[in-house]
Amino acid sequence: MNSLLATPPVPPHFYEHVRLSPSRSMSSANSSGNRKRKAEDDNPSDHDTRMSASPSNSPALAPRPLPTARQIKRPRPNISGRPLPLSRLLETLDTDALRSVLRSMCNRHPELETEVVHTAPRPSVSSALQVLSNYESTLQSSFPLGGNSSSDYAYNRVRQHITNLLDALNDFTPHFLPPNESQVSTALSYLDGATEILHRLPRWDTPQHNLEKDVAYEEIAKAWIVVIREAGKRGGGIQLQYGGWDLKLSKHNQTAGGKLQDAINVLSSSLGWMGGHQDSSASQGGDPSSIRHQLLSGTYGSSSPLKVSKW
């Protein structure tokens, strides 16, 4: 019975051809063990941690401003003609055209005249003298070529331009007189330039034609007197002599043929306490006894030493 249950012997030729096929799990385990180990294999979550964390030494990046959206004008669906805006219209006007527009508006609406006067900037001495010089240039360019420039024919050619210049002079002069002009130096500067322009007006062969210029000299002399008296109230008139206005007015009087003598007399009385002389030769020589000469030379008070009283 035991012999029947015994395992039959295995023939020898079965042992020669037996091959053990390795399992897939063992080969993969051996191959993974033979590979070089990387840092990611030890701690796979460390890479994620380092990538999510901010570097401590990296500089902070300033936020970039977002670009503003450009406002693009859309084309009008229906284009049609329209007048210019006021700002564009004023850009096309030159000085003469703009002056004409303002003048016509003030004529039609007189209440605007006061508004324009208060809104416009105050004219300076240079701007006023420039206007007078423009009138003078127009006058000089109107003389006939050749012939006698002081004849009646030449006078008739330029008569209107002379009237325009003298009218402008009569309008500008009161503007620079006190009390409308508070600065004496500004008033004197204007009168100096206006008198120079008046000197350059032509003299005519016919004495009657010179009447307009002679009247203008009388008016400018009165203006000098007003300013000189106002300057005499401020600091005793020292500004007149310190600025050399005594010499300038004396020169104007000589050029005008003595027609500014009244202004010279008023100036002499205003500067009488200072020992000033209105004669040009004496003033240019520099009288050592005058207070002005002593102040400018630094010798004022040197001839009279200071007396010290006893205690």
Swiss-Prot record:
The domain of life for this entry's organism is Eukaryota
Q: Which residues form a coiled coil?
A: none
By its UniProt entry, which InterPro entries does this protein fall under? Cut8/Sts1_fam, Cut8/Sts1_sf
Keywords recorded for this protein, A-Z: Cytoplasm, Nucleus, Protein transport, Transport
Work out whether the entry's keyword set contains Isomerase. no
Q: Which family does it belong to?
A: Belongs to the cut8/STS1 family.
PANTHER family, per the entry: FI02826P
State the protein's name.
Answer: Tethering factor for nuclear proteasome STS1
Q: Which organism is it from?
A: Paracoccidioides brasiliensis (strain Pb18)
